[in-house]
């Protein structure tokens, strides 16, 4: 127990260290910022030598891998140009390899000043959505709210959508569709060959983590001061969680865990 708490404490404290290098990396715009969605259709690597300014909803298509190097920083604008939040959506059959390290975590955050984030830390961009082929309680497929034409669910419990390790997701939860605020990390029908380890969601407007069905396992994950639940499961999620930590605020928060087994009627 002491070892686990020490591990979580070290990771969480490291996540809130101000990294001065954020300001000095080359800035690379991702998306046009005019409301046009960006499809990634070839294998792509985001380098730690750049800071990526996310200004569109970005879709990683089937058969394509988005690799993000350790230490990379992605800053998302408040809008995609059409009053919806920028976000990264990994489609079924797509892969994200965001394999950071303890000393070089990968950071998704808001492209805002410290003053703005201090005044209102939640809901400044969308979040990360991963769609897989793992089973749902009701069978078949479904769709994440606000994401049209991108299904999740299937029959492959051992499906892999890639790796998220030593990843930080901050200040998200803005709407990606009409009245559809999203979670910091949405795992929709994601299979148990996907690695989710040492992932932190902080100051998200909606849930920290939400699993819609699927079998993905979570280890060393933290949800800090989110506006709704720390961890939320729906549609017959059957994965496992180990070393999960939630810290909730006193003014805006939901539950540490909310778990539903079937589709909502």
Residue ranges of predicted features:
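Beta-strand/loop edge motif enriched in small/polar residues
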Residues: 24-265
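Short intrinsically disordered, low-complexity coil segments enriched in acidic
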Residues: 1-2, 19
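Bacterial N-terminal signal peptides that target proteins for export
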Residues: 2-12
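Bacterial N-terminal signal peptides
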Residues: 10-21
